């Protein structure tokens, strides 16, 4: 959209996956699409990201704590610096770990007017038994000793967004692929059902024949469809 100096703009907080990946100075077409429609785009490398050493990147047992705090502080800092951003029209999205973080945010604050959670983690306990890396990855990331036992289950459940879903008030779109074995479809379904039970506006979009890499190497029409779903959800809730 044409820039208008006095007009406030909505913004998208985009959270990378991993968590041990990193945003760099590269062209990212999704951000360009949103900017072209009149959004500001916010992104940063929070604790858990690569690029600042192993201690900074080690998020085991701390999911939803220092990373969440860093994202909220970052959002506050952006809003303080860029007064053109409308704090009442903030959107958030992310995939994989970014999807986990999207789920965590919507269950811990209602500062975002809408969210799009992609290929996400909702429940570490269920994911431990259905993900292709679940038996190893989930206990390790939740600082649990094994798949089994009350203490391990407690630790995984404590770090699960689904546990806190009754707090969610944010209209949320869930996107999953039915051949995603990393963050399987039931993770998004659980969150969607929890929001429905609490009368929160939600939508689940399933891409058939796609996997965890839909956004990167999916069929072209499905990649376009995915971005249209996300952007349309944002447009609807920000009034663009």
Placement of each model-derived feature along the sequence:
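Short beta-strand-to-loop junctions in surface cap/lid or active-site-entrance loops
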Residues: 1-7, 160-162
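Short beta-strand element of the alpha/beta-hydrolase
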Residues: 6-17
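Active-site-proximal cap/loop segments of hydrolase catalytic domains
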Residues: 43-240
